[in-house]
């Protein structure tokens, strides 16, 4: 259970050094590849015709295999972390698939570690590239993708479930239903908040005065957290988790961070990465299905601020601020370094919320 986690990649118990080993593309070992190939063989009932590991960053291992006709995508964990959230991811994609939402089809999920040393999912292999490919190449049609994103998120947020926060794995496993593990949205929002603020202050990333202003904003706006019903949120709706063409979204992947909560939080995540004109078009598209008011727009900045805290923390301790210009996060619409951009987004959020 993710009972004491706000954002898994930032807050789970692995050491920083272990996270660095796990999150980067050179993490694949002979043992991890061998285990994955055994899973593929077990699934097919015979040796796969094709099998390759995909050199991707992130907290999972990714592989491609085929039986000579159908292609499959295999995703595993490291077998070390006590986390079974793949069950939630698979249940979410199954539910969304019933509504014809563009998500991968899942064929198998296992988290019991009985037969293999890792937890895993087997899904359809989608050959369409991520939108980050086009973003990095400067060929992305921002207006079209903003409209597509607004439509997708508005449809996603029509899916509502009891409680808040991460999906309760015990309930999902025992009762076969989706619900959150927190009784209130505020309980989830405040998880690890003191840790995030303390880290940023202790490492002199944010000043004591800035921390005080942030705490004041969260206290003053805490009534926004009093919501009665939560929507399904992706919580990492970024270009690398969206597949498609320069003009069109074809699938949304990686539901590892999905929670039940305030729809404005999902848009706050998007706002962490995108320019005002992108957000304006997205909101126009979003509001065609789910009308928004000025309070909703202010809440987007409220959640942008909350999410930029953990983002800045993980970017610092993972050494992202020291990566060269080729690092994918170093490209942004303000043409700033990643550290400058992170601090600018925090300052923008504070300034927007201070004028309310």
Set out the residue ranges of the language-model regions:
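Active-site acidic catalytic loop and adjacent metal/ATP-binding pocket
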Residues: 58-65, 74, 106, 156, ...
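Juxta-kinase regulatory segment immediately upstream of eukaryotic protein kinase catalytic domains
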Residues: 2-46
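ATP-binding pocket architecture of kinase catalytic cores
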Residues: 50-190, 205
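An alpha-helical support segment within catalytic cores of ATP-dependent transferases
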Residues: 27-47, 114, 141-147, 154-234, ...
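Glycine-rich, phosphate-binding/catalytic loops in enzymes
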Residues: 91, 139-140, 251, 268-270, ...
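Short, surface-exposed alpha-helical segments at coil->helix boundaries
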Residues: 33-34, 90, 280
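Helix-rich C-terminal or lid/interface subdomains of diverse kinases
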Residues: 147, 226-229, 269-356
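Short, surface-exposed acidic
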Residues: 45-52, 207-211, 291-299
């Amino acid at each position: 259970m993710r009972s004491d986690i706000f954002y898994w990649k930032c807050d789970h118990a692995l050491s920083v050094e272990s996270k660095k080993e796990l999150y980067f593309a050179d993490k694949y070992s002979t043992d991890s590849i061998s285990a994955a190939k055994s899973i593929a063989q077990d699934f097919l009932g015979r040796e796969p015709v094709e099998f390759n590991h995909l050199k991707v960053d992130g907290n999972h291992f990714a592989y491609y295999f085929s039986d000579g006709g159908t292609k499959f995508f295999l995703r595993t964990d490291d077998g070390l972390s006590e986390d079974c959230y793949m069950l939630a991811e698979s249940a979410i994609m199954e539910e969304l698939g019933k509504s014809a939402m563009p998500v991968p089809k899942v064929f198998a999920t296992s988290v019991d570690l009985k037969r293999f040393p890792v937890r895993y999912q087997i899904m359809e292999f989608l050959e369409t590239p991520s939108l980050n490919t086009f973003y990095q190449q400067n060929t992305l049609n921002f207006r079209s993708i903003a409209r597509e994103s607004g439509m997708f998120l508005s449809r996603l947020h029509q899916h509502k479930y009891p409680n808040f926060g991460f999906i309760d794995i015990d309930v999902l496993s025992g009762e076969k239903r989706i619900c959150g593990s927190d009784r209130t949205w505020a309980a989830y929002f405040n998880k690890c908040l003191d840790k995030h603020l303390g880290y940023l202050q202790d490492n002199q990333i944010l000043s004591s005065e800035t921390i005080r202003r942030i705490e004041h904003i969260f206290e003053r706006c805490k009534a926004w957290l009093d919501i009665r019903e939560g929507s399904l949120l992706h919580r990492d709706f970024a270009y690398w988790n969206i597949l498609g063409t320069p003009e069109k979204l074809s699938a949304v992947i990686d539901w590892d961070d999905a929670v039940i909560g305030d729809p404005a939080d999902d848009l706050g995540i998007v706002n962490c990465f995108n320019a005002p004109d992108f957000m304006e078009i997205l909101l126009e598209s979003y509001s065609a299905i789910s009308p928004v008011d000025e309070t909703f727009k202010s809440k987007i900045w409220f959640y942008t601020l909350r999410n930029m805290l953990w983002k800045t923390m993980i970017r610092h301790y993972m050494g992202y601020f020291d990566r060269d210009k080729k690092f994918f996060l170093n490209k942004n619409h303000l043409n700033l370094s990643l550290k400058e951009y992170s601090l600018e987004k925090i300052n923008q959020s504070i300034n927007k919320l201070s004028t309310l």
